[in-house]
Curated annotation (Swiss-Prot):
Classification via InterPro entries: Ribosomal_bS21 (IPR001911), Ribosomal_bS21_CS (IPR018278), Ribosomal_bS21_sf (IPR038380)
PROSITE patterns, sorted: RIBOSOMAL_S21
Native source organism of the sequence: Streptococcus pneumoniae serotype 4 (strain ATCC BAA-334 / TIGR4)
Protein family per UniProt: Belongs to the bacterial ribosomal protein bS21 family.
Disulfide bond annotation, renumbered to this chain: none
Highest taxon, organism lineage: Bacteria
Entry protein name: Small ribosomal subunit protein bS21
Family matches, as HAMAP family: Ribosomal_bS21
Region (Disordered): 39-58
Keywords, ordered alphabetically: Ribonucleoprotein, Ribosomal protein
Amino acid sequence: MSKTVVRKNESLDDALRRFKRAVTKAGTLQETRKREFYEKPSVKRKRKSEVARKRKKF
């Protein structure tokens, strides 16, 4: 979990921006979206192979 302490004389917007950057860098939001719904192993394999196919195409 990301934690951000508001510094002295720092606006709330700046602290929020630092927090969002930390969350993005840690991959927390992406991981949460990925785990939001259960995905069967067969569907995971299919999605993984499609991503690899797209990556290989370029």
